[in-house]
Amino acid sequence: MKASLITAFVLPLLALASPYLPTDPPANIEVTARHPGRENVDKLPMQAAGRAFWLGGSPATYCPEIVGDNCPPGNATVILGLNSMSVLVPGGQQMYVEPSGKLGFTQAHSAAIPPGSYVGGFAYKPLNKKSGSFYFGGWGATALMACPVPDSKYYQVFANIKNAMVPGGDVKKCVEFVGVAKEYKGTTPAAWQYT
């Protein structure tokens, strides 16, 4: 009798007390690399520049003069709905992964994507109440990786796909990282366009 009372009343109360983890990502996220012990990538923000993604530095953005004071700040790389950039430019900017594994985004005013690229496939897994893991889950990938670029101080972001074609050609020099996604609380859209 006592065991059935515990099962009937106590266990449901314990379930209610357990921490709730949201399964849906926030609409607008910023991503920061986490790989403790690898200071060359750990805690660096993922930035959009040159139609690619990088760790560190600043985003490359543009806003036409005619927009004037209505230009979004353009000082953060913000992802909208996991698969596109948080931009005001008509038509938006979609994200993709090239056959090489390189993460990229479309040029403003164009839907052109490199042949063979994977559109979609970006995912979010809750880590706690305030953040989640942002990653690419297509083509057998399970994480993101930062790859050194010859003659650059920045690391370029790739999906950890088999046979990735990375700058310098040596995938062993790349560093896998957890893309920690947190809600962006600034002005949205975050930029007119990323360049």
Curated annotation (Swiss-Prot):
It comes from Arthroderma benhamiae (strain ATCC MYA-4681 / CBS 112371). It comes from the Eukaryota. InterPro entries: PhiA_domain. It is found in: Secreted. The lineage of its organism: Eukaryota, Fungi, Dikarya, Ascomycota, Pezizomycotina. Keywords: Glycoprotein, Secreted, Signal. This is Uncharacterized secreted protein ARB_07637. Glycans are attached at residue 75. GO terms for cellular component: extracellular region. Its main location: secreted. Residues 1-17 form the signal peptide. The keyword Glycoprotein applies.
